[in-house]
Amino acid sequence: MAQVQFYGTGRRKNAIARVRLVPGEGRIIVNNRPLNEYFGQKILEMLVRQPLEVTDMAGRFDVLARVEGGGTTGQAGAIRLGIARALLQADGDLRPVLKRNGFLTRDPRMKERRKYGLKKARKAPQFSKR
């Protein structure tokens, strides 16, 4: 018999996460490594776990995530959005809870491009009056 799986895609900055929820005991695997081994920072682990804890689904599903691009913060945010969308697929009644906590909103902030004549996106070279 085929196992029930739920999918969700999350993006944040330049990171893209493809998340699969499989019935299990609450393991979170990111790119074939356990969550704490992959990120190493407690704050990022908490960020990833938030949707599961708010909806009381922490022990019901194993999370299998493939994430690429971006840095650690962007990847954690992308996984969080992917988990939230997959949970919504699993149980539509969770929408108000997830929406209230802001887990279904894609963060639109991106790195601003560098402009010519400037050192960074907005940092100008030192101005000399004379």
From Swiss-Prot:
InterPro entries: Ribosomal_Su5_D2-typ_SF, Ribosomal_uS9, Ribosomal_uS9_bac/plastid, Ribosomal_uS9_CS, Ribsml_uS5_D2-typ_fold_subgr. Residues 111-130 have a biased composition (Basic residues). GO terms for molecular function: RNA binding; structural constituent of ribosome. Keywords: Ribonucleoprotein, Ribosomal protein. One of its GO terms (biological process) is translation. Residues 104-130 are annotated as: Disordered. GO terms for cellular component: cytosolic small ribosomal subunit. Belongs to the universal ribosomal protein uS9 family. HAMAP family: Ribosomal_uS9_B (MF_00532_B). This is Small ribosomal subunit protein uS9. The gene is rpsI.
